[in-house]
UniProtKB/Swiss-Prot annotation:
Disulfide bonds join 48-94, 120-130, 170-180. This is Interleukin-11 receptor subunit alpha. Also expressed in normal and malignant prostate epithelial cell lines. Expression levels are increased in prostate carcinoma. A motif (WSXWS motif) lies at residues 304-308. GO terms for biological process: cytokine-mediated signaling pathway; developmental process; embryo implantation; head development; interleukin-11-mediated signaling pathway; positive regulation of cell population proliferation. Changing residue 355 to E: Decreases proteolyisis by ADAM10. SUPFAM superfamilies: Fibronectin type III, Immunoglobulin. On IL11 binding, forms a multimer complex with IL6ST/gp130. Belongs to the type I cytokine receptor family. Type 3 subfamily. The chain crosses the membrane at residues 371-391. Residues 24-370 are extracellular. Coiled coil: none annotated.
Length: 422
């Protein structure tokens, strides 16, 4: 295992070394042929690509007849630019002693790479992906080397870890994108992600330890629909499905939260449904409502998903029941003679309309349950006190001889022990 780790590490180091070889004379590993790189404020060496190393050449700027460096400089085929800046960028021409064109070199200035910013996220329990971005812009062509390895804990009381398994390449999907995907991950394992940024001036590595429990973030639910409830002008029914990326297994469940608001209203109302649908009972009649939903692991691992795209729905246009008339008004209204062909109108009911009580049902149920609980508690306390008093009196009645002076006032004098008979 350790041999495979060291082997792949040597391969990665070799690749990085080859990529950074641009700092050597006449590099060809980066960019188009003839482009060489340097850092602002540092000395830069350019080499003539068409001559043998060490052969003296003359250097000119492209389009300028002025000689920058002659063949007697003692620098051979190299041109040295002290403390290069942006004005030094451009194309240079080198000529041999016989005036033949040795080649052209284009100078591009930039900065060495810094450690990239890396973050990882898991959309399910089996796969996770990592993305990265440069912490500073180098201005140079840049490549990234990505790999990962798995770490296992030896014991709960041990702070040491077993040798890491891997590393393995983390394939970039698609190739060249700032994202790599790890397939077939283990939920209870920890992983170390290695992202190395490489450009012609160097390499910099970022290591990130992750666990699926902490980076789990499902995709938002799909298929959100909002429908009116016929005959209920203040109700909406919302339904949705699991995200397609979530595994269809009974022990991997999601919980949901739903938000809704009327049109032109900035504040959202939030509820946590128990399943894959929810009936909104306090919608504003006649107004369209925006609804959105998000998901999270049922055991609160990771974080909530992003919100789903909003879906819109308008409650039913059924008539809202009017207020119940007072008792006196019921008897003072003039009676209308029913027509022969039309059915008799229904008699007014003194009972409140059930729709008017929908929003008060839950409050009344809570009040009734609280009252029953208080009455039950008081009944238990009274029963306990009565039982204790009864047991105390019973023990007192079974006691043998009465205590001195006990009930002495109610015993006749002539029956007291030792009293003379008169």
């Amino acid at each position: 295992m350790s041999s495979s780790c060291s082997g792949l590490s040597r391969v990665l180091v070799a690749v990085a070394t080859a990529l950074v070889s641009a700092s050597s004379p006449c590099p060809q590993a980066w960019g188009p042929p003839g482009v060489q790189y340097g850092q602002p404020g540092r000395s830069v060496k350019l080499c003539c690509p068409g001559v043998t190393a060490g052969d003296p050449v003359s250097w000119f700027r492209d389009g300028e007849p002025k000689l920058l460096q002659g063949p007697d400089s003692g620098l051979g085929h190299e041109l040295v630019l002290a403390q290069a800046d942006s004005t030094d960028e451009g194309t240079y021409i080198c000529q041999t002693l016989d005036g033949a064109l040795g080649g052209t070199v284009t100078l591009q200035l930039g900065y060495p790479p810094a450690r990239p910013v890396v973050s990882c996220q898991a959309a399910d329990y089996e796969n996770f992906s990592c993305t990265w971005s440069p912490s500073q812009i180098s201005g140079l062509p840049t490549r990234y080397l990505t790999s990962y390895r798995k770490k296992t804990v030896l014991g709960a009381d041990s702070q040491r870890r077993s040798p890491s398994t891997g590393p393995w390449p983390c394939p970039q999907d698609p190739l060249g994108a700032a994202r790599c995907v790890v397939h077939g991950a283990e939920f209870w394992s920890q992983y170390r992600i290695n992202v190395t940024e490489v450009n012609p001036l160097g390499a910099s590595t970022r290591l990130l330890d992750v666990s699926l429990q902490s980076i789990l973030r499902p995709d938002p639910p799909q298929g959100l629909r909002v429908e009116s409830v016929p005959g209920y002008p203040r109700r909406l029914r919302a339904s949705w499905t699991y995200p397609a990326s979530w595994p269809c297994q009974p022990h991997f469940l999601l919980k949901f939260r739903l938000q809704y608001r009327p049109a032109q209203h900035p504040a959202w109302s939030t509820v946590e449904p128990a399943g894959l649908e929810e009936v909104i009972t306090d919608a504003v009649a006649g107004l369209p409502h925006a609804v959105r939903v998000s998901a999270r692991d049922f055991l609160d691992a990771g974080t909530w998903s992003t919100w789903s795209p909003e879906a819109w729905g308008t409650p039913s246009t059924g008539t809202i029941p009017k207020e119940i008339p007072a008792w006196g008004q019921l008897h003072t209204q003039p009676e209308v003679e029913p027509q022969v062909d039309s059915p008799a109108p229904p008699r007014p009911s003194l009972q409140p309309h059930p729709r008017l009580l929908d929003h008060r049902d839950s409050v009344e149920q809570v009040a009734v349950l609280a009252s029953l609980g208080i009455l039950s508690f008081l009944g238990l306390v009274a029963g306990a006190l009565a039982l204790g008093l009864w047991l105390r009196l019973r023990r007192g009645g079974k006691d043998g001889s009465p205590k001195p002076g006990f009930l002495a006032s109610v015993i006749p004098v002539d029956r007291r022990p030792g009293a003379p008979n008169l």
